[in-house]
From Swiss-Prot:
This is Endoplasmic reticulum resident protein 29. Does not seem to be a disulfide isomerase. Plays an important role in the processing of secretory proteins within the ER. It is found in: Endoplasmic reticulum lumen; Melanosome. The gene is ERP29. The lineage of its organism: Eukaryota, Metazoa, Chordata, Craniata, Vertebrata. The keyword Oxidoreductase does not apply. The modification Phosphotyrosine is found at residue 32. It comes from Trichosurus vulpecula (Brush-tailed possum).
């Protein structure tokens, strides 16, 4: 899981892959 290097890319991918799990994105943002 490379979230420290692919934060913006992961965000877009997450939005397209898991648009219903917006809370997951928030959690990733908090960790970042």
């Amino acid at each position: 899981l490379h979230t420290k290097g692919s934060v913006p890319l992961d965000t877009i991918t997450f939005y397209k892959v898991i648009p219903k799990h917006k809370f997951v994105l928030v959690k990733f943002d908090t960790q970042y």
